[in-house]
């Protein structure tokens, strides 16, 4: 694949030395680690204790969320009266885990509960008229939507006309008007003063469950087994790993590693992961894509069936199907990505200025979001990938750091049939005759708003570090910064003037990666294992014994039951290329 332009390394300003010294002394840690804590807003011993020891006692009161009282009361009325409940969610990981979580909880109290996942190709994203018709046919009196519904004004009206109440649980940005549902739970509502507004869709569903349990005497500890579903949502939907999300993810990972639900146990087995050592990265790169593949290639209903399965044998059968879908998805993804790259390189795309817009009516709608991400990796500019589905042009958009692509799409709302999403990722649908004007206006808007420096990927370096500092104790404390994610990334370090110890080799299909044992000149016996993905173009320079600089994160590598410290190199510069940082 074509590589994005060279990254700019930006070394963050060190924290106040007095604060660093004080915190390092109080907590008994290395100054580098104290500096990292202060950069995360942790400046006192008490704050450090809370950071290193997340507690479920620190979760916010769910009744601080607007409409929670009425939502809980309406759900309880349905449960005790034997009214049929339909749990409705999006087909992606966040939606299917949310549906699995709420469905699993509600079925503890009633068997009058069903779930519905819209078909990506037939119905598209969000609440559909077909889904409401399903609720009518199945006799449901209450629909609870998860990870969707905040814009479903007409669908809520239609449901009401059929005698069906709706509770909306969403985390997307609402428009000026809200649906006239019984309750609208969304921490991003302007009139909602919930203290944390970056919950995932599944997170909003969990707050409903938490509130229901508190109101009606369900012990909180019985909710802990649901947290493995929630951490999969938090990691896969890339919400911030701070505040309440970090607490929930911490205990969700614990549940996932110690006693996962049968569906996630099947995913762990099929992903060839080390039981008991599943990380956020494993969710993002192994488990999440497999669950997503169900909705991309077949039906998201399969994912919920997997995640609510009560027997491992059944879960493994469903998991095998999903695994096959994921393999098919990867093949199609590769083919379409190459076709899209060819279109860009031959100038055969709708737009390739400040933005990139490519369109092929034959592409599989289920993978266009992935392809958009690949193009951003390759060219580092806001990208829209479009195909044709059900007579409309539809697709996905992905942005670069610092640029609000959702705002650009919103500026073309008059040309669109539907759109939704976040600042950095969105989906849209439009009529084919509007495509040229959409491309023109998107490019015009983005050209006017984007800043030149945004077009160069930036690697933020937290601190310079000598290899001598990377001791078992240092790494043991660093691990307690987990779980990592947006807002609490795995720290990035810079070490200058390093060498390969002589054992470096190319690895991976086609030899595009490198496995190196690194040393610094003044510490030739202190070797550290490292992995550099897609950087084999530097291999000759390194094998000739030349020095280079690296920025990297420190990770724990598990292999055949053994663990070791490994550097995951994010970028590498040959010494003659260094112009200072």
What is each of the regions a protein language model found here?
Residues 37, 90-92, 144, 170, ...:
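Divalent metal-coordination and catalytic microenvironments
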Residues 107, 112, 136, 246-343, ...:
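Acidic, two-metal ion nucleic-acid-processing modules in DNA metabolism proteins
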Residues 384-399:
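Short glycine-cluster motifs
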Residues 66-179, 184-185, 335, 339, ...:
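N-terminal small/polar loop signature for handling phosphorylated ligands or for N-terminal nucleophile
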Residues 137-140, 148, 153-296, 300-309, ...:
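Functional cores that coordinate and move charged inorganic groups
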Residues 1-81, 232, 286-321:
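Cofactor-/ligand-binding subdomain signature composed of acidic, glycine-rich
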Residues 48-59, 83, 108-117, 187-189, ...:
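Gly-rich Lys/Arg/Thr-decorated short loops/hinges at beta-loop-alpha junctions or inter-strand turns
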Residues 346-372:
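Flexible, glycine/threonine-enriched loop-and-boundary segments that flank and lead into catalytic domains
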């Amino acid at each position: 694949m074509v590589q994005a332009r060279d990254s700019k390394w930006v070394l963050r300003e060190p924290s106040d030395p007095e604060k660093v010294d004080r915190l390092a002394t109080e907590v008994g840690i290395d100054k580098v680690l104290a500096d990292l804590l202060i950069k995360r807003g942790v400046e006192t011993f008490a704050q450090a204790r809370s950071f290193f020891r997340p507690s479920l006692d620190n979760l916010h009161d769910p009744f601080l969320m607007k409409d929670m009282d009425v939502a809980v009361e309406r759900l309880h009325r349905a449960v005790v009266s034997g009214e049929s409940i339909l749990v409705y969610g999006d087909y992606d990981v966040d939606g299917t885990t949310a549906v699995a979580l709420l469905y699993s909880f509600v079925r503890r109290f009633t068997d009058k509960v069903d779930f519905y996942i819209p078909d990506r190709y037939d119905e598209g994203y969000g609440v559909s008229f077909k889904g409401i018709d399903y609720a009518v046919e199945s006799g449901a009196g209450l629909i609870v939507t998860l990870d969707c519904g905040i814009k479903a004004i007409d669908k809520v009206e239609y449901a009401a006309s059929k005698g069906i109440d709706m509770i909306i649980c969403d985390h997307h940005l609402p428009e000026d008007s809200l649906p006239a549902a019984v309750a609208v739970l969304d921490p991003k509502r302007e009139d909602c003063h919930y203290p944390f507004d970056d919950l995932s869709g599944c997170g909003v569903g969990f707050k409903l469950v938490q509130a229901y349990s508190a109101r009606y005497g369900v012990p909180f500890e019985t909710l802990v087994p649901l947290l493995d579903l929630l951490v999969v949502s938090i990691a896969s939907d890339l919400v911030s790993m701070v505040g309440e999300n970090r607490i929930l993810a911490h205990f969700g990972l614990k549940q996932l590693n110690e006693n996962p639900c049968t569906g996630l146990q099947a995913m762990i087995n099929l992903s060839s992961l080390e039981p008991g050592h599943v990380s956020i990265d494993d969710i993002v790169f192994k488990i999440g894509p497999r669950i997503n593949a169900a909705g991309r290639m077949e039906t998201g209903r399969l994912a919920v069936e997997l995640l609510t399965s009560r027997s491992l044998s059944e879960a493994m059968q469903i998991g095998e199907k999903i695994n096959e879908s994921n393999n098919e998805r990867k093949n199609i993804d590769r083919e379409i990505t190459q076709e899209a790259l060819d279109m860009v390189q031959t100038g055969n795309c709708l737009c390739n200025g400040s933005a990139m817009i490519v369109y092929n009516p034959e592409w599989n709608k289920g993978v266009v979001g992935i392809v958009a991400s690949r193009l951003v990796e390759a060219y580092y500019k806001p990208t829209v990938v479009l195909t044709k589905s059900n007579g409309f042009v539809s697709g996905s958009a992905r942005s670069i750091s610092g640029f609000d692509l959702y705002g650009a799409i919103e500026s073309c709302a008059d040309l669109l049939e539907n759109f939704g999403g976040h600042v950095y990722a969105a989906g849209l649908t439009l009529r084919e005759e509007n495509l040229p004007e959409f491309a023109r206006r998107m490019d015009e808007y983005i050209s006017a708003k984007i800043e030149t420096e945004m077009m160069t990927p930036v690697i933020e370096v937290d601190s310079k570090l000598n290899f001598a500092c990377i001791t078992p104790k240092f790494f043991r404390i660093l691990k307690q910064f987990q779980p990592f994610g947006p807002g609490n990334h795995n720290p990035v370090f810079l070490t200058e003037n390093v060498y390969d110890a002589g054992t470096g080799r190319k690895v991976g299909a086609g030899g595009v990666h490198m496995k190196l044992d690194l040393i610094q000149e003044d510490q030739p016996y202190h070797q550290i294992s490292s992995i550099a993905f897609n950087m084999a173009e530097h291999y000759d320079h390194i094998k000739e014994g030349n020095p280079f600089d690296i920025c990297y994160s420190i990770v724990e590598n598990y292999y055949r039951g053994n663990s070791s410290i490994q550097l995951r190199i994010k970028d590498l510069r040959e010494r003659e290329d260094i112009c200072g940082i």
